[in-house]
């Protein structure tokens, strides 16, 4: 992988057309990975939603700048603009339908933004988590948009997703991150979050004006915008259809500030496990910052090997962390991490200057990964291949990860997910009985206790054993689902079990029948 700064200066239509031609192969690879993440049966079931949503968005296009850019880029990619809008719509649909279709949940970008006051100025650090290992991290890009009559924008993305502004720098002197937020609403008359961000950034002359632009829009689903300016002001806005929540801070008074995917207000029911997962990751980072020595912040945030055995909590970086960027607005410097599979502290860091956009400087060369990092990267590849339906290769990488992993808590986690995969794919009861005995010996950390109890019950029901677990052993929010699984007819139970969808990177096992 190599991060490249791509200038888009002058005629934006011609630039995007030529960019599309160059990125055609990468886009189709990206599209294959995302559609491979979706099971064929479920994909057919919500395919009409995607297409109708894309058509609705295109009807609204008029002469908007965003759609002109999409059309030019799509022409270069060799696809109809509606096909690219269908691709974008997957992220919106995932935000809403992820509870029903577990495969979609894997499309949601996980995020961590760390804002700090340092001797070098005010710093914005960002981790991007996405199930796009082998795509995003193979072709990371910094796109520099310089269009007449509009403010200059630098966005961090990858080939095939140039118009999607997950992480940007505005030339008035502010940085902006988009974070997905769990929510329950789907606003059919809303605009794509990417259109809202794209047009708002190119229209607004400042951070305050950008926030005002956000207020004029209705989103399809729930997202968060996190912004920082040269004075250390940090603004946070959650947008959910026409509703918006807002908070403001100043790093001179409140540093550091850590944000993940937790809503600013009104945590939605049904997402308790995910919210707790985000909270633990924030706690890990806060503790890590308190013990910081002379370590680059991006290395600190991806230092996954630094995990306690007792009172274990998940690090802020995950098995799907594919992007890591640091922005120093005052100095006009951008640092990015580059590495294979999930990023870790041993991976290299490169610097780009906003003043000299041809300069790419090595800040820290790649180091030899330790045993933990090797196992971590193997586990990230396991989930990636699982998402693509390559079960044999996925299982191979997960076995490798478990065999190599030196950390006791993570060994138990990986053993547990091996049991989940075996439960999903093994039909022979004798073989499954061996897996069940292995499962009963596993001592998973607290975030997986509920799922361990669920899997014990599922194994016992599938094997026709007396139940050794009870609904009272799982969290109150899951007790009704637990009881339901114990009591439904066997044919329905069997169908549900086929649809289980494990996601190692957020320590969860999704079930389509769990609402």
Task: Give, region by region, the residue ranges found by the protein language model.
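Structural signature of tandem alpha-helical TPR/SEL1-like repeats
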Residues: 429-431
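C-terminus-biased signal that marks the final domain/tail of proteins
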Residues: 1-109, 201-242, 250-427, 437-464, ...
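A contiguous strand-loop segment
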Residues: 60-194, 217-225
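Short, surface-exposed beta-strand-loop junctions and turns on beta-sheet-rich folds
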Residues: 130-132, 182-184, 242-244, 341-344
């Amino acid at each position: 992988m190599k991060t490249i700064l791509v200038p888009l200066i002058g005629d934006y239509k011609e630039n995007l057309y030529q960019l599309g031609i160059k990125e055609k192969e990468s886009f189709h690879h990206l599209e294959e990975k995302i559609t491979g993440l979706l099971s064929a049966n479920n994909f057919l079931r919500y395919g009409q939603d995607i297409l109708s949503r894309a058509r609705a968005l295109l009807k609204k296009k008029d002469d908007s700048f965003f759609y002109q850019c999409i059309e030019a880029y799509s022409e270069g990619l060799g696809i109809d603009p509606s096909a690219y809008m269908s691709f974008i719509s997957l992220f919106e649909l995932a935000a809403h339908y992820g509870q029903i279709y577990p495969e979609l949940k894997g499309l949601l970008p996980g995020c961590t933004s760390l804002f700090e006051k340092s001797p070098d100025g005010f710093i914005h650090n960002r981790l991007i988590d996405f199930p796009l290992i082998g795509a995003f991290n193979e072709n990371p890009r910094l796109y520099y948009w310089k269009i007449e009559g509009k403010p200059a924008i630098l966005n961090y993305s990858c080939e095939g997703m140039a118009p999607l502004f997950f992480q940007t720098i505005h030339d008035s002197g502010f940085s902006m991150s988009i974070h997905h937020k769990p929510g329950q609403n789907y606003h059919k008359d809303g605009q794509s979050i990417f259109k809202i961000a794209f047009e708002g950034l190119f229209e607004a002359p400042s951070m305050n004006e950008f926030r005002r632009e956000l207020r004029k829009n209705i989103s399809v689903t729930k997202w968060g915008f996190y912004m920082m300016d040269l004075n250390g002001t940090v603004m946070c806005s959650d947008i959910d259809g026409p509703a918006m929540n807002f908070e403001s801070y100043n790093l001179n008074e409140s540093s550091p500030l850590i944000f993940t995917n937790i809503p600013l207000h009104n945590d939605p029911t049904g997402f308790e496990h995910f919210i707790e997962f985000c909270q633990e990751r924030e706690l890990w980072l806060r503790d890590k910052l308190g013990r910081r020595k002379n370590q680059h912040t991006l290395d600190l945030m991806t230092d996954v090997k630094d995990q306690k055995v007792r009172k274990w909590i998940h690090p802020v970086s995950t098995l799907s962390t594919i992007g890591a960027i640091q922005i120093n607005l005052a100095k006009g410097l951008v640092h990015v991490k580059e590495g294979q599979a999930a990023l870790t502290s041993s991976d290299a860091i490169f610097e780009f200057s906003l003043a000299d956009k041809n300069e790419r400087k090595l800040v820290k060369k790649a180091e030899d990964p330790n045993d933990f990092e090797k196992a971590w990267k193997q586990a990230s590849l396991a989930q990636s291949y699982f998402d693509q339906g390559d079960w044999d290769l996925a299982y191979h990488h997960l076995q490798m990860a478990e065999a190599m992993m030196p950390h006791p808590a993570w060994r138990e986690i990986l053993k547990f997910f091996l049991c989940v995969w075996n439960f999903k794919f093994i039909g022979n009861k004798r073989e499954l009985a061996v897996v069940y005995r292995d499962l009963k010996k596993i001592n998973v950390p607290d975030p997986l206790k509920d799922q361990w109890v669920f899997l014990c019950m599922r194994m016992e029901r599938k094997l026709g054993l007396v139940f050794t677990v009870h609904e009272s052993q799982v969290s109150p929010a899951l007790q009704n689902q637990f009881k339901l699984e114990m009591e439904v007819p066997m044919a329905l139970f069997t169908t549900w079990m086929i649809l289980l969808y494990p996601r190692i990177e957020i320590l969860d096992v999704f079930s389509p029948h769990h609402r």
